[in-house]
Regions:
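Targeting-peptide/extracellular-domain and disordered-appendage signature
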Residues: 1-166
């Protein structure tokens, strides 16, 4: 279940990794958030900001010891920002993160591929991350407790060791 859950207050999708380009090592981080605005849920106007989509991204030139970063925010809708409920497909203006299942392999688990595209003022990314192992669930069956109360929890899993290209 990689899609958005609009009834929940906050969700995020993030990727971190490193990639080599032109004999240089770069670190990268891209995070998309979806946040439900509780105070606007009963409003009838299409202009009510019921869901906010925001994102930040960074690239580090390891050898050059420089970091570049940027961020975006918009309310969902109007063709500007969206987080699909059916799969990981998040878009915020010209930034995106999408997921797709890969054709069946001999692996004992289903592999998937993520792609992120980010056009920032000082950098751009177009990366594909292909799964190499099954997801790792955090906590009890992916439910990660954040406090003593049952509602103080979130579902959380990681997909490490993805093969990165782009």
């Amino acid at each position: 279940d990689h899609g958005s859950h609009p009834e929940l207050r906050t969700e995020w999708w993030y990727i971190t990794g490193q990639v080599r380009a032109e004999q240089r090592l770069y670190g990268f981080q891209v995070t998309f958030f979806r946040s439900r605005v509780d105070g606007t849920q009963s409003m009838q106007s299409e202009f009510a900001a019921r869901q906010l989509i925001f994102a930040h991204a960074a690239v580090t030139d390891v050898q050059g010891k420089r970091q570049f970063h940027d961020q975006r925010i918009a309310r969902a809708g109007f063709g500007i920002a969206d987080a699909s409920t059916t799969d990981a497909a998040i878009r915020l203006r010209d930034w995106s993160l999408t997921r797709r299942d890969l054709p069946s392999t001999t692996a004992a688990f289903a592999l998937s591929q993520f792609r992120t595209q980010v056009v920032a003022s000082d950098f751009s990314l177009d990366l594909t991350m292909t799964g190499t192992q099954p997801p790792i669930l955090q906590g009890a069956q992916g439910l990660s407790r954040k406090g003593p109360l049952p509602e103080q929890a979130s579902y959380y899993y990681s997909e490490p060791q993805r093969a990165v290209s782009g």
